[in-house]
């Protein structure tokens, strides 16, 4: 569940389209400035970690732009940002571009429905069949006689990539009837407002306003993600080039991986790498 700090940041993201302390471009002339861009799932907790790091390191400025995993990785490759945030594994060509990856957290992806939906569990195969258009009515999976409104993330989203990889289908197989939206917050809002909708969001965004379905009878929680019994999970990564990142940028990564930093990760609804 989102805590108050992440919820506040999420509202800002929805209203502004991105959340940034500054302008979000790399500036090698200022060794105390850390520029970060990428995943909208990773961004809110990195903002909070950044605030804590700034408070401990006078003069340090951390800029965060939430622009999607693929865009953030591109920025890390071309040096626009010191660090790219990704909510998916790096692709072979991204690794070949010289990026070093650091896993900072683990995230389960929740399959969500409206609070009034009587379906509480789906098999992984049923989720796949819904998203590929083979199952189109809730009565086919034990629900009411109503059409399923499929909601998915935009192309380039790390959450979408992680979801599709774990569920087992490619982008071209996604049903043509799917509604496409950006950001876990927007997906959650759509599902809240439509009794027949199904969507998927980052674990940290789940709250009492939606149903997080069990998958093959397994609940989404930290223990089940860590022991691999919950089927839909992905890493939160930082990606950087060694010749671009500053010493303070490296120090920030060390802070996130410390016990204090990982406690912040867990306090905000995500799963520690420790």
List the predicted regions and their residue ranges.
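Exported/periplasmic ABC-transporter solute-binding proteins
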Residues: 6, 23-78, 82-274
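C-terminal motif of bacterial Sec signal peptides marking the signal peptidase cleavage site
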Residues: 18-22
């Amino acid at each position: 569940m989102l805590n108050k700090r992440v919820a506040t940041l999420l509202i800002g993201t929805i209203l502004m389209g991105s959340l940034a302390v500054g302008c979000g471009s790399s500036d090698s002339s200022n060794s105390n400035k850390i520029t970060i861009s990428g995943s909208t799932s990773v961004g809110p907790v990195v903002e909070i970690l950044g605030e804590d790091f700034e408070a401990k390191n006078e003069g340090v400025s951390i800029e965060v732009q939430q622009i999607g995993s693929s865009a953030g990785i591109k920025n890390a490759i071309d040096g626009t940002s010191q660090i790219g945030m990704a909510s998916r594994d790096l692709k072979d060509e991204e690794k070949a571009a010289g990026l070093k990856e650091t896993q900072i957290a683990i995230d389960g992806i929740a399959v969500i429905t409206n609070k009034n939906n009587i379906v509480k569990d789906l098999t992984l195969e049923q989720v796949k069949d819904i998203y590929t258009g083979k199952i189109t009515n809730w009565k086919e999976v034990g629900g009411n006689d109503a059409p399923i409104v499929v909601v998915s993330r935009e192309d380039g989203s790390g959450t979408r990539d992680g979801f599709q990889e774990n569920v087992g289908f490619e982008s071209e197989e996604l049903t043509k009837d799917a509604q496409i939206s950006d950001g876990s917050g927007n997906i959650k809002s759509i599902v809240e407002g439509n009794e027949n909708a199904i969507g998927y969001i980052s674990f940290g965004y789940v709250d009492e306003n939606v149903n997080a379905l069990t998958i093959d009878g397994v609940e989404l929680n930290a223990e089940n993600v860590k022991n691999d019994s919950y089927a839909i999970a992905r890493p939160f990564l930082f990606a950087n080039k060694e010749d671009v990142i500053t010493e303070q940028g490296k120090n920030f990564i060390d802070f996130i991986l410390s016990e204090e930093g990982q406690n912040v990760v867990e306090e905000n609804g995500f799963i520690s790498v420790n």
